[in-house]
């Protein structure tokens, strides 16, 4: 029998190997072919995976053989030999490679009482001393420097995994290397497929949705859920209900299993979706009444059109046109907004002849809240204009009455606001499908607002004009993650995110 440590299967009375406890001590070095659900897979020659468990303050690590499999296998799936005998279960994974856990090659069994252990990828060409890696000359000088110190008790172990050699070093409190082991085998570190989340704490919903996204984008895995509250399963289901927007992606990839004090969410990635699992795309489009964030399918359609067309050409300039009073079509509103944008001064309380449209947005804010609102709202509003038809944002015009209000600030503060606007626009990520790769084109003006009889004023309306962009403008990086080999969750950049789309 084989028991996965990820599911609480560690038993000190059984044989223990990286990630599993078992009733038999199986030497997995002797196999060249294994079978999972009647499909055969070859063991990779001369390449291994360093796997470990940390259970009950015990570290169990070893170099294990691995096999290549392009299908998703879940933790605990049985692995058989060619005669049909079960020899292990699925534990660790690195991309399309799965470890075969049991008696492997070089191993490390430690008591973690009072010591830590760290794992590193050893970069090609680098040498190692203690807890650092660098080019050989730098490491040589480091070793000379540290040799002058007296050795102290070991406080940390460092496991270095390289393409041709693996090493284990130990260090004292000063970073002096106390001991070293070398294994003349090339290996990889697994992509961790177990994430621990506590519910009932601050940001638990964010942590849960982030973990779901990261695991689905990394081939699948398990989330171990604990809670201070008694009914962990009840609390978990409440949190899952609150992130229902993710269920369109994960509903058929998720299974919740109740344990005594914790729950396990088992997930697999079907690789059939054209999009990565994404909490928020941060791609916005402008409608008549609002700036709306695209969901994954809307983003796919929008980006597909851009990719097929190779980007968009600039919109032609508006032609001068005499229009009767009361006309409220989009083109007329845009012309009125252009005229308003070019005004040299405004009167407090005057009525603006146009309201919000697909090209125009009004907003009013106090001087005290001005920079905060710009930071919070500018990226989504301006990127939505850039992704649609371009447009105008007027800060200081009441959204309901359409009257000029403005905001009153000093000259120095106005310069800070201007720099903020420039900074936030320049930070907007653009993913290009065209050859020109042009920047976002915009103009910003501060129009003075006078009260009747005043000759001077410190009241302004901020007017920002954004042209339609050639390609896709993001308000921020998409909220879409993956697991790296260190066990950290990393967010995809916009370019990385788009590159993973199956157009």
Curated annotation (Swiss-Prot):
Q: What EC number(s) does the entry state?
A: 3.1.-.-
Quaternary state and partners of this protein? Homodimer.
The name on file for this protein is: Poxin-Schlafen
Gene3D superfamilies in UniProt? Schlafen, AAA domain
- Which Pfam families does the UniProt record give? B3R, SLFN_AlbA_2
Q: Does the keyword Nuclease apply?
A: yes
Its annotated function is as follows: Nuclease that is responsible for viral evasion of host cGAS-STING innate immunity. Cleaves 2',3'-cGAMP which is produced by host cGAS following recognition of intracellular foreign DNA and blocks the subsequent 2',3'-cGAMP-mediated activation of TMEM173/STING which normally spreads to adjacent cells and activates the interferon and NF-kappa-B immune responses.
Q: Which GO terms describe its molecular function?
A: 2',3'-cyclic GMP-AMP binding; nuclease activity
User: Please, one GO biological process term?
Assistant: symbiont-mediated suppression of host innate immune response
Could you tell me what reaction this enzyme catalyses?
A: 2',3'-cGAMP + H2O = Gp(2'-5')Ap(3') + H(+)
Q: In chain numbering, where does the site feature Substrate binding fall? A: 58, 103, 147, 167, 180, 182, 184
Q: Where is the active site?
A: 15, 136, 140
Tell me more from the record.
Answer: In some poxviruses, the poxin is expressed as a poxin-schlafen fusion protein.
**Which organism does this sequence originate in?**
Monkeypox virus (strain Zaire-96-I-16)
The annotated region (Schlafen-like) lies at: 237-503
Report the sequence similarity comment from the record: In the N-terminal section; belongs to the poxin family. In the C-terminal section; belongs to the Schlafen protein family. Subgroup poxviridae B3 subfamily.
Q: Which HAMAP family match?
A: Poxins (MF_04143)
Quick check: keyword Cell membrane in the entry? no
